Every structure is written in structure tokens, then in C-alpha cells.
Regions:
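Active-site neighborhoods and metal-handling regions in enzymes and metal-associated proteins
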Residues: 1-131
Length: 131
């Protein structure tokens, strides 16, 4: 699912003060909608909602799921949010949901998960180096 990573990176790049989680979520929906045809999934009336069951993010705080942040709350510097769009193909019993955590700053968001391996190639390369 190589198409998954660029849009996750896009959300990390676009997240900024003044935006809402709803706006970030719409970017994910738009990304997936544009790709259903190329994946052969836009058939039998299926839409993004058939493959994407939840929002892109939630605020991260003292609790894993900090409930103080609504989809309409405006992001501010100092907030930490997740970026975990998810995509599921129920009939094939597969799905992907990789979470990055980011810090909203005055400038670009800081990817707090940047050093964690997430692609198949990176994980396999790391595993092959282990004895």
C-alpha cells in the first residue's frame, strides 16, 4: 500500500495552527476518493466510507485519547496530535493504520515518530541485520 504513506506525510506537512482536525480529515477523504479507482475499489457503489471508518487524528495528552479536542477545535502551538488515517478492505480481511504523533508548532509540525520504521522495506532491512 505504497499510496498510503504520501498522504500520511501530507497531513503531517499540512497540520498547522489555525487548522481543525475536520480539515485534516477531509484531506484524507479526498486523497482516498481520488485513489479508489486506481485500486479497483470503486465498484458496486462503494465509497471512501466503506474503507475508512474513523477520523485521521485525535489529541494526545495525559490520556492516550484526550477527549478535550473536538473535530472543530482549532489547533494551537504546543498541541500533540496523532496522524493515523487507516484504510481497511473488509472483504480481504486486511487493513493498515500506522500512527505518527506530531507536535503543532508556530512553523512546521514536528514528527515525533519520524525515526520509527514503518515501510515493509525498512522493517525487512532492519530485521535482516539482526543476528
Amino acid at each position: 500500500m505504497i499510496w498510503y504513506y504520501p498522504q500520511q506525510d501530507l497531513i503531517i506537512e499540512k497540520a498547522a495552527p489555525g487548522m481543525t482536525l475536520r480539515e485534516l480529515n477531509q484531506m484524507v477523504i479526498d486523497h482516498y476518493a481520488a485513489r479508489l479507482d486506481e485500486l479497483g475499489l470503486a465498484k458496486d457503489g462503494k465509497t471512501v466510507a466503506d474503507y475508512y471508518y474513523h477520523g485521521v487524528s485525535h489529541q494526545l495528552g495525559l490520556d492516550t485519547h484526550d477527549i478535550s479536542c473536538s473535530d472543530y477545535e482549532v489547533l494551537e502551538p504546543g498541541m500533540v496530535i496523532t496522524v493515523e488515517p487507516g484504510f481497511y478492505i473488509e472483504e480481504e480481511e486486511i487493513g493498515i493504520r500506522i500512527e505518527n504523533d506530531i507536535l503543532i508548532t508556530e512553523g512546521k509540525a514536528v514528527d515525533l515518530s519520524k525515526g520509527i520504521l514503518k515501510t515493509t522495506e525498512d522493517i525487512e532491512a532492519w530485521m535482516s541485520k539482526r543476528d
